[in-house]
Amino acid sequence: MILSNRNGLKNTRNMLRVFGGLNETYSCTEAEYSAGINFSARNFPALSTRLPRRKLRETAELNGMYHLNGLLMVCGTRLVYTPDDPDELEVTLENAVEDGKKTLVGIGTKILIFPDKLAFDTVSREVSALGAVWSGANASMEFAPCDAEGRVYEVSGSGPSEPENPKDGQLFLRVEDPEKPWSSESTLEVYSEASGNWSAVVLDCCRISAKGVGANFRAEDTVALSGSGAEQAGQWSGLDGDRIVRDASEDALRVRADPGGEWFYGRLTRTGAAVRWVSLDGSVRREFVSAETVRLERRVPDMDYLTECDNRIWGCSSKENVIYACKLGDPSNWFSYRGIAADSYAVTVGSDGAFTGAATCMGYALFFKENTLHKLYGSKPSDFQLSSLRCRGVAKGAARSLCVINETLYYLSPDGVMAWDGSIPTKVSTALDPARLRNVKSALGGALDGRYYLHLVRGSGEAQTVRLLVYDTERGLWQEEDVCSYEMTGSGGQLYLWDGKAVWAADAEREENWQRADSLEEGVRFELVSGDIGLDRPEEQYLSRLTLRLEAEAKSRFELAVSYDGGAWETLAQRTADGRRCFDIPFVPRRCGSLRLRLKGRGQITLRSLTRTSAAARGGILAQEVN
């Protein structure tokens, strides 16, 4: 028997074992997914659901979080601090702050709280004000010239030449101009019997005495003094202004003040608006009225964006074009200009637009506008330098998206998510829908194990949309998780998130007693929609079989569905696992131009592989061609 030659139909098989991440663009491939939630690249090249979170505590109001030797939470008007050391007790401070959103930054052992301008000390567990104000509207106070030790002197005589036969320690005012005997041109002298000489007493300070005047100030503070009336009295020509506090006690403080004025050698006493000047020997009195109120203030500028760099807090405001830096290691002094390396610093920038954020990266203090990056560098105020770069900066409302991961700064710009490594910012969000990254109302960033968490809020009211995107910086893959991130802060080894009701730890295994079932998230809800499958096949082939290999890591259930050529979803399989188990799910698809797969459920699963079997087409690829 002779059989005629017949053409064989050869099948080809391809196994996809390397999966990408979220790709919302037209270029989404079979290895990526076009939409999905709660998947991660933790088991790359496989695709796994994210790890369950652990609930740490419930709180319905949270205005900010920061981690420094422990977790500080601003809950309404309360401060709650939980130390990292489990043997230490949690601290709660009632009515410590005003109710409202906070900007927090750490320096040393302190966490600064703005706009309240407070500092929480993680060692003493106390809150203190950065600024301080004393006002003497009705107070009785005295201004008197004094020496470096704070001593105020009284003289028994004055004249153009020293008296004969003086006693040891005798004081005398040597007058240079008889018409102005009490002016700073005269010299206060003291006699020393041991040396037999008169020596000048330098009065280069002013002692300010009043009830409670020095309670909130300390040595080396720079305070702004106003309303003293000293210039009106002719005692000091420039006492009002910024003064350096040499020492302070409850009811007195000493400030640096150069001698100057026609009525310098005397005491100035104020009681309300009444002002009296009395010479050092009590022989001359002068009285007048001053409408000004004496005020002493340690000023702290209003700032919206803060960062720490080289033991200084740097800040700026969206309302002015000035960058501030505090005194070295002292966040309570912002206007200390003494010509030394520890001075405060301020610089005005000339770029247009408002500041939108601040951060520190690679040793630089960085300040952003929507179209500009300002970089400050140097070791001390005398050699600080400011450079500017026109580039895609931080979007308005996205100041908290700034986050440093592995020496690279990530942030949300008006054009998408950017990465800055010291040169030019580069865009890393090309796989995301750009329309969903624009016109953001607020953005918040966090970091954990090389992953960049980005919380986005767009719109308001019923039209408001909220997303939590996760970028794997090592692999360049995007994922999306369910929103649990209205507030975020990281400790380096953990990421804390607040969902509006409770605070969660992103990695439950890093918390103490993480196995407790009552605190672990129950069954992670997940969903994934693949990219179009089949678009890369030649016309002479069609998909004859698809096989998914999945692994359940814990108690899980899931459903697999398919959509042909953009049609309705058709359920292919439903599976349940009580523990770790592997599944092979094969199915024979209809002939179509392309198909998409949807995988959704609850639990912990890993997509290990997707095997495609293609066969030669006879009668056309599409179903309508066969018919």
Feature-to-residue mapping (PLM):
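Short, surface-exposed terminal/edge motifs of secreted or surface/virion proteins that either
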Residues: Y81, K117-V133, Q170-V202, G234-S237, ...
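Conserved beta-strand position repeated once per blade in WD40 beta-propeller domains
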Residues: G64, T103-L104, Y305, G357, ...
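N-terminal beta-propeller domains
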Residues: M1-E88, E142-E149, R298-K375, L456-V470
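Beta-sheet repeat architectures centered on beta-propellers
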Residues: I2-G70, V394-G397, E407-T408, D415, ...
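Short hydrophobic/aromatic-rich beta-strand motifs
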Residues: L71-L72, T109-I113, P163-V190, E220-S226, ...
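Small/polar beta-strand repeat architecture
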Residues: S4-G8, L130-G131, W182-T187, Y191-V300
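Short loop/turn segments that connect beta-strands within the blades of beta-propeller domains
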Residues: L68, C75-G76, I107, F114-D116, ...
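Trp- and S/T/G-rich repeat-edge/linker motifs of beta-rich repeat architectures
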Residues: F39-T59, L79-D99, D121-V152, A194-L203, ...
